[in-house]
Amino acid sequence: PCEVGKDAPAYILFTSGTTGRPKGVPVTFGNVEAFLEAFALLGISLLPEDRCLQMFDLTFDLSVGSYLPPLIAGACVYTVRLGSIKWQEVFRLMDDYRLTVTLMVPSVIHYLRPYLSELSAPDLRYSLFCGEALMVDDVVPWKQVASHATVWNVYGPTENTIYCTAYRVGSHDI
């Protein structure tokens, strides 16, 4: 195998362009390594038997956060089917495969809200939310579905390698 330095690009993603034109962001192997180290410091311990959700387009940086840590841990990654309605597919995957780890945008809860009484996620250990503001009004019904899950609110722009801030939502927050 060839040696790859920390400054070498691991991949390039484009920003959404909300502040102007989209721009390509080269993410280095050093950036990815730092993200994985920070992820481990959160205390989120992925196991080979975990079943993890990957709901994002591969052009979105959150997709990397959805598949890279699980694959490194030897866990399974379940993806939404191409062309599917994402919230319906999330419901199906959670129900069919008893997912243990999810990283989603909070709006998924809004779409699932009418069906939450039909969904039970007792195996869900970690539920991370990113990409939009996570409101208490979303967390309360979600915790009824996923009562054993630790909920995290994470955030970060593409330029900071997936996400760079994390807050563990506790019972005192809801």
Positions of PLM-derived features:
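Motif- and composition-driven signal specific to adenylation
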Residues: P1-I174
